[in-house]
UniProtKB/Swiss-Prot annotation:
One of its GO terms (molecular function) is large ribosomal subunit rRNA binding. CDD domains: Ribosomal_uL14. HAMAP family: Ribosomal_uL14. Binds to 23S rRNA. Forms part of two intersubunit bridges in the 70S ribosome. Part of the 50S ribosomal subunit. Forms a cluster with proteins L3 and L19. In the 70S ribosome, L14 and L19 interact and together make contacts with the 16S rRNA in bridges B5 and B8. This is Large ribosomal subunit protein uL14. GO terms for biological process: translation. Keywords: Ribonucleoprotein, Ribosomal protein, RNA-binding, rRNA-binding.
Amino acid sequence: MVSFMTRLNVADNTGAKQVGIIKVLGSTRKRYAFLGDVVVVSVKDAIPSGMVKKGQVLRAVIVRTKKGQQRKDGTHLKFDDNACVLIKEDKSPRGTRIFGPVARELRERGYNKILSLAVEVV
């Protein structure tokens, strides 16, 4: 569960290291983003030779959260950090590699390309 101005680690190779959430997309009253939600982010920290630059405004999908999430089978899912993957308008990832584990809930939201690039799906 992440909200406005939360800092997220970036789990891909676009060159961004950290981003800050500007807006949680969805309904007008949506305050928090969970696994698989799309958010509008601003790049806060990036490497100089990367695809994206500091200050750029992009879309991202949440792939890991510290706040635990209950699954329908009763298991509880919790990660060590809050992380996202930068995406294009057509839901495809901007980078070519995904670092770290990602949640299986992304499959239900239609992010199969992110799951195929991920090292580990939990």
